[in-house]
Amino acid sequence: MKHLSRKCRSATPVARKAGKKIRPAVLWFTGLSGSGKSTIARKVVSKLKKLGADVEHLDGDTMRSIFPNTGFTKSARDEHIKRVGFLAGMLEKHGVFVVASFVSPYRESRDAVRSLCRTFIEVYVSTPVEECERRDAKGLYTKARRGKISNFTGISDPYEPPKHPELAIDTTGMTVAESTSLVMNYLMGKR
C-alpha cells in the first residue's frame, strides 16, 4: 500500500486471542492539525469497542478544554503532553486501551510518553502541510500565515516527525475507512 510508509516492526501486542480480551495499549496518533488524527482515532475507538475493548479516547481539543490555561509555547506543550501521557499510562496500567490524538509536535515529549506506557504504539499521520491547509475548515492555517496565531505547528512552530513510528499513514487521497483499516490491521496483526 503506497500510503503505509513502513511495515510494522514486530507482531502486534494487542491482537485478541481466541475469546480473550484485547490487551490494553496506548495508541498515540501524532501529526499536523488537519492531518486526520482525530477522525481516524474516533473510528478506531468505535471498532475497538465493537470488539469488546475497554477503550478511552483522549483528544487534543477535549483535553485543552479541561486544561484551558495550557499555552502553545514549547515548554507548555511539553508539560501538557507529559500530563496526558501520564494519564494514558495510568489508564493502560488499569486495563484500559487508550487512543490518543494530539499534534504533539516534539519527539522528546512523545518519547517521554512512550516511557510512561507499557505498550506504546505511535501512529504518525504524515499528511503534508499543503493537504492539511486545504482541509482546514477552521481557517487556522490562514490565521497562522497572517500572523494572527503564533506558535502554530507546521507554520511558525516546528513539527518533529517521529523517527521510528510503529505505523505511518499519509491520508492524502485516502478515505477515513481506508486509514482506519490500516490501523486496525496493524493492531490485529494483519500485515
Predicted regions span which residues?
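The conserved Walker
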Residues: 33
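Hydrophobic anchor at the beta1->P-loop junction of P-loop NTPases
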Residues: 29
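Conserved lysine of the Walker
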Residues: 37
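Extreme N-terminal, non-catalytic leader segments
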Residues: 1-26
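Conserved beta-strand scaffold positions in the cores of enzyme catalytic domains, especially
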Residues: 57, 120-122, 166-168
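ATP-dependent NMP and nucleoside kinases share a basic, alpha-helical "lid"
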Residues: 66, 70-71, 88-145, 151
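Small-molecule kinase domains that catalyze NTP-dependent phosphoryl transfer to phosphate-bearing small molecules
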Residues: 126-129, 134-182, 189-190
